[in-house]
Curated annotation (Swiss-Prot):
It comes from Acaryochloris marina (strain MBIC 11017). It is found in: Cellular thylakoid membrane. It is an enzyme of class 7 (translocase). InterPro entries: NAD(P)H_OxRDtase_bac/plastid, NADH_UbQ/plastoQ_OxRdtase_su3, NDAH_ubi_oxred_su3_sf. It catalyses: a plastoquinone + NADH + (n+1) H(+)(in) = a plastoquinol + NAD(+) + n H(+)(out); a plastoquinone + NADPH + (n+1) H(+)(in) = a plastoquinol + NADP(+) + n H(+)(out). GO terms for molecular function: NADH dehydrogenase (ubiquinone) activity; quinone binding. It is a multi-pass membrane protein. GO terms for biological process: photosynthesis, light reaction. PANTHER family: NADH-UBIQUINONE OXIDOREDUCTASE CHAIN 3. This is NAD(P)H-quinone oxidoreductase subunit 3.
């Protein structure tokens, strides 16, 4: 047998990860019914008749709350592996994490002072 380095496994994994969704999407396109009637083009409202238009305006405050949520959600994603390996990383990694948290807190205070978190 051939000895594979880590790159061949990575290439195979990426190929498999690209191939499976492509096959699933092409299979669904081949197997789906092709009826494009007027009822099929209407929106589905949990079995109810649609009320109003589909294009409505949302308040910009929803966007601001979502943006702040995403920022702190990404912070959690970055800090979780750090917290798991904290005892192995040492003091320098602790200081770097504190700087990272401080930058995010400065951003939160800025958003708070600008009124991005106030619903008025």
């Amino acid at each position: 047998m051939f000895a594979l380095s880590g790159y061949e496994y990575l290439l195979g994994f990426l190929l498999l990860c690209s191939l499976v969704p492509a096959l699933a999407l092409s299979a669904s396109k081949v197997l789906r019914p092709s009826n494009q009637g007027a009822v099929r083009r209407t929106t589905y409202e949990s079995g109810m008749e649609p009320v109003g238009g589909a294009w409505i305006q949302f308040n910009i405050r929803y966007y601001m709350f979502a943006l702040v949520f995403v920022i702190f959600d990404v912070e959690t994603v970055f800090l979780y592996p750090w917290a798991v390996a904290f005892h192995k990383l040492g003091v320098l990694a602790f200081i770097e994490a504190l700087i990272f948290i401080a930058i995010l807190i400065v951003g939160l205070v800025y958003a708070w002072r600008k009124g991005a978190l106030e619903w008025s």
